[in-house]
């Protein structure tokens, strides 16, 4: 009754796209729930906590490192997956210099929303084109190839958590005056019931402002990036599913007037070692991003990514999220039909 029968998925074959990870991770869930707004999400959480269910939050489920699906079938309690893709609004504030990203909003939609303002999101990596969510990236400090901007990070968020007494509570660290009670706060944010005077400007960060300095420390003993870096664990940032994120406040960036992509190849990895050190220590402007690609990856892309190439060339990137969703559905069906090969879409 709360979300409507259409958005409570219990049939096994209908649950599979939500129970299976992009690269790995799968397991059985009691149900998949798809709330349409913050109030529905909040009330679902209260029911799940009362019933002592395990809650796995999920948005686009495009992650390559797992976490958005069950992992095996040896959990001690029933699992409920809450998929947030219907809660996908993005609100622009401070002349589009910042955004409020709702739980299921995607980098792809944000990129398009910022275009008229000549600005772009923090993340401009490949997952943008396949529908990756904004919140998922921040919860995992994603953006490993982003040299200039570094990890996805903010100290401004609205999220739910269990307190020490095991009670569900809503934490408003968004820096916007939205009211006192949980449902008032959620309803006001959902409907944009706030004005510029309600937006608080303080020292809390909406992006990682130190990474460009850290990454230049080429002679330091510690790496510029590593898992569970305490510097990047704050509220929703780096939470990895331990809290339920309703919304994030994030910085946006001026769009570069000129961009150029360089592809460099070598049989000697020491060449790249020297290039990396020279770029980080001597360049006035850091590259937006950089990636290493092994020859095997190149060969695999050449063999298996012709469909992507054709779609981008003929239709542009707009169709890519739909293509990847179709690909996933085909592979799930093929895995259940004995005479069809696994990963049928790649053949």
Please name every model-derived segment:
Residues 3, 50-53, 118-121, 280-289:
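A common structural junction motif
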Residues 7-12, 34-35, 55-59, 66, ...:
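General beta-strand structural signal in soluble alpha/beta enzymes
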Residues 72-87, 92-134:
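Anion-binding (especially nucleotide phosphate/pyrophosphate-binding) glycine-rich loop
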């Amino acid at each position: 009754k709360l979300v409507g029968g259409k958005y409570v998925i219990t049939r096994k074959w209908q649950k599979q796209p939500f129970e299976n990870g992009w690269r790995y991770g799968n397991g059985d869930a009691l149900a998949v729930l798809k709330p349409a707004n913050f109030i529905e999400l909040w009330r679902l959480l209260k029911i799940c906590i009362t019933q002592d269910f395990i809650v796995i939050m999920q948005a686009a489920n495009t992650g390559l490192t797992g976490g958005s699906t069950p992992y095996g079938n040896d959990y001690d309690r029933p699992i409920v997956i809450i998929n947030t893709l219907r809660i996908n609004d993005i609100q622009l504030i401070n002349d589009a210099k910042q955004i409020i990203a709702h739980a299921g909003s995607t980098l792809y939609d944000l990129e398009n929303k910022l275009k008229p303002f000549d600005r772009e999101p923090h993340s401009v990596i490949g997952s943008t084109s396949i529908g990756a969510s904004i919140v998922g990236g921040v919860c995992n400090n994603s953006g490993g190839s982003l040299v200039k901007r570094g990890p996805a990070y903010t100290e401004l968020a609205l999220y739910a958590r269990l307190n020490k007494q095991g009670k569900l509570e809503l934490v408003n660290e968004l820096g916007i005056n939205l009211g006192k009670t949980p449902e008032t706060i959620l309803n006001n944010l959902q409907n944009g019931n706030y004005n510029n005077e309600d937006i608080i400007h303080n020292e809390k960060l909406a992006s990682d402002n130190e990474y460009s300095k850290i990454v230049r420390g080429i002679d330091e003993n510690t790496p510029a990036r590593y898992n569970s870096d305490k510097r990047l664990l704050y509220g929703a940032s780096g939470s990895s599913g331990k809290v339920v994120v309703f919304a994030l406040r994030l910085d946006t960036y001026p769009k570069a007037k000129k961009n150029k992509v360089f592809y460099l190849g070598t049989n000697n990895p020491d060449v790249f070692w020297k290039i990396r050190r020279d770029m980080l220590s001597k360049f006035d402007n850091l590259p937006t991003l950089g990636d290493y690609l092994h020859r095997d990856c190149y060969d695999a892309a050449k063999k298996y990514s012709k469909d992507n190439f054709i779609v981008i060339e003929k239709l542009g990137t707009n169709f890519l999220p739909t293509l990847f969703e179709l690909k996933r559905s085909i592979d799930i069906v093929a895995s259940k039909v004995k005479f069809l090969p696994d990963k049928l879409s790649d053949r």
